[in-house]
Amino acid sequence: MNNEVFPNKFKAALAAHQVQIGCWSALANPISTEVLGLAGFDWLVLDGEHAPNDVTTLIPQLMALKGSISAPVVRVPTNEPVIIKRMLDIGFYNFLIPFVETKEQAINAVAATRYPPEGIRGVSVSHRANMFGTVPDYFVQSNKNITILVQIESQLGVDNVDAIAATEGVDGIFVGPSDLAAALGHLGNASHPQVQKAIQHIFARAKANGKPSGILAPVEADARRYLEWGATFVAVGSDLGVFRTGTQRLADSFKK
């Protein structure tokens, strides 16, 4: 059995500022996730915040991605150490932490993924991530192979973006466009000039601090604009969105 899980190639690609094109997985189903894994995306977000996912639904999705080139990234429902620990133990190495507004919150997110003395991650000697105790040097290698992406989606987060981006252990800054738009008074309108200006500012400050930036942009024109603005890791759609629009288009083509 191949029990080599390191190094984390997605983390290395981000550190090298290589463009990484991703997709959102929101259907909470191993078959749809497996299909996404066959498409050739660099990374996939398995959403634990707005999709009906938990440990029991995420494990089969991780299994479905075994052998895929797509790096699984879990968006946890909240920045909470026990939740993060459980995601680590089932086999996630890449984390998207929602609603980070301060440097302290970013520090706490990093600490939750690191074993002592660098952090506070609880220790289990046998779990899915270390292939039930068979991965050589897991405890030595784990801390330096975890990816932490923090999500900026409020005015306070925008105000503190430099301090957040400069936090040791933070690998990238991700913009939550819908929540950011709502926070800026433009609910449902991420295209508003004020929101777009804030997004561009976040990208610029991430770059100034040597960190890659990312965003979810299911509209192709938006995704290409964000890439031109310097975003490195961009999710260009979702399984739910593709399924909904594709089936609607198919039905409409025959019913009109």
Curated annotation (Swiss-Prot):
It catalyses: 5-dehydro-4-deoxy-D-glucarate = 2-hydroxy-3-oxopropanoate + pyruvate; 2-dehydro-3-deoxy-D-glucarate = 2-hydroxy-3-oxopropanoate + pyruvate. Gene3D superfamilies: Phosphoenolpyruvate-binding domains (3.20.20.60). Mg(2+) binds at E153, D179. The keyword Isomerase does not apply. Keywords: Lyase, Magnesium, Metal-binding. The record marks D89 as: Increases basicity of active site His. Its EC number is 4.1.2.20. One of its GO terms (biological process) is galactarate catabolic process. The active site is at H50. Pathway: Carbohydrate acid metabolism; galactarate degradation; D-glycerate from galactarate: step 2/3. Pfam families: HpcH_HpaI (PF03328). InterPro entries: Aldolase/citrate-lyase_domain (IPR005000), GarL (IPR017648), HpcH-HpaI_aldolase (IPR050251), Pyrv/PenolPyrv_kinase-like_dom (IPR015813), Pyrv_kinase-like_dom_sf (IPR040442). Catalyzes the reversible retro-aldol cleavage of both 5-keto-4-deoxy-D-glucarate and 2-keto-3-deoxy-D-glucarate to pyruvate and tartronic semialdehyde. Belongs to the HpcH/HpaI aldolase family. KDGluc aldolase subfamily. This is 5-keto-4-deoxy-D-glucarate aldolase.
